[in-house]
Amino acid sequence: MEQIVSSLWSDCLNHLQTKVSPIDYSTWLRPLQASFANEELTLYAQNPFVENWVKDKFLTEIIDLARFLSKNEQLKITIRVGNKPTEQNLSASSTNKEELTQDTVHKFKTGLNGRLTFDNFVQGKSNQLAKAVAQQVADNPGESHCNPFSLYGGTGLGKTHLLHAVGNEILKRNPQARVVYIHSERFVQDMVKALKNNTIENFKKFYRSLDVLMIDDIQFFAKKEASQEEFFHTFNSLFERNKQIILASDHFPKNIENIEERIKSRLNWGVSTAIEPPELETRVAILMKKAEERNVELPEEVAFYLGQKLRTNVRELEGAINRVSAWCNFTKRQITIDAVRETLKDLIASYDHLVTIENIQKIVAEYYNIKMADLKSKSRTRSIARPRQMAMALAKELTSHSLPEIGREFGGRDHTTVMHACKTINELRDTDNSIQEDYTNLTRKLSS
């Protein structure tokens, strides 16, 4: 039974690691110990502070996840302070096979997080199109022009949130709908288990009987030929019956490596929408929203400071709020810029080291195949001026330097020149797909 406990809690941690920030995972979840007895999973925290924090922030999700993974709706999960007992009387199931059937899975295992909705999704320029399409899919699941619906973008930008929001909205309108959200790795694991237990027909029947199938991180299907084969036939079965398919990946579907061309072709049948890294205003709005959800009083000037310093993704913004909140609760200090600077000094230092104006100039010059000196020159030719404007806009977005400081790094230009460059690039991103693609590619390079 110890092996069963270890496997269940390990599976829970693997799933939680994809849903929370690295900071939250390493600080609050990974150190927890687990034991199992009398149909109860007990988690052990190192002190009362950790116990209360996990209870408030993560226990509901842990309960849902543990019941889903154990296929036991009655499983009881508690958390207490202490260490895991060295010897336990553990009760085990007498069955070795876990059949994946429509009745046992769909009854309570949609995989959805009910807290991830459209209402608490913070919209900005970087994600407004993705949210609009997601809402359209939720309104009319299965419509041909949005089926399949593919979301793509970097880690922690809100793809998973939108998938859950679509599923929750569909179930809200039609509680009888068969809706399942699943990570691609879980799809693979379920298939392997079904093959091992000789229940592959139940596996096929379940997935092909759904009304809405949402698979996250489909890039993990790469090089898994058997899983791709099964997904291909599942896709065809659902599509032919006008059932909604929603997928998320870290790259534009046709650019995912080691995925069969016939699958890529089908992903192009519907609509693919990117989610970009959030701009400053959206980052600030996200920070304020996350603070409000946690009943944390976050001064606006602190939110702007954090928004300027942390520029990569939503997950890290949320992790920063959790870390600052925990520190201030523990020390009984108010959240100030000085407190944030002290608490997140390692994280902020890593960003400051990663994204500098010089680094931006280097990456932009390489991308456009020009010299760094060209960006600082007086040349006004289009082949030089446009990359220079792009570099200025990126410097404004990805660093905390002022406009005059940015101008000085580009050949001593005036701050009004930098303002004009930022305005030009922002306008072109709305009208010129090639500029938008360049901006996205450069942002990813600078944030990776």
Curated annotation (Swiss-Prot):
Region listing for Domain II, in residue ranges: 94-110
InterPro entries, sorted: AAA+_ATPase, Chromosome_initiator_DnaA, Chromosome_initiator_DnaA-like, Chromosome_initiator_DnaA_CS, DnaA_C, DnaA_dom, DnaA_N_dom, DnaA_N_sf
Chain segments carrying region Domain III, AAA+ region: 111-328
Cellular component aspect of the GO annotation: cytoplasm; plasma membrane
Localization in the cell: Cytoplasm
Residue numbers binding ATP: G156, G158, K159, T160
GO process annotations (BP): DNA replication initiation; regulation of DNA replication
Location of region: Domain IV, binds dsDNA: 329-448
Region (Domain I, interacts with DnaA modulators): 1-93
Broad class of the protein's primary localization: cytoplasm
Source organism superkingdom: Bacteria
GO molecular function, one term: DNA replication origin binding
HAMAP family, alphabetized: DnaA_bact
Subunit structure comment from the entry: Oligomerizes as a right-handed, spiral filament on DNA at oriC.
Family: Belongs to the DnaA family.
Record function comment: Plays an essential role in the initiation and regulation of chromosomal replication. ATP-DnaA binds to the origin of replication (oriC) to initiate formation of the DNA replication initiation complex once per cell cycle. Binds the DnaA box (a 9 base pair repeat at the origin) and separates the double-stranded (ds)DNA. Forms a right-handed helical filament on oriC DNA; dsDNA binds to the exterior of the filament while single-stranded (ss)DNA is stabiized in the filament's interior.
Protein name: Chromosomal replication initiator protein DnaA
Species assigned in the record: Haemophilus ducreyi (strain 35000HP / ATCC 700724)
Gene (name only): dnaA
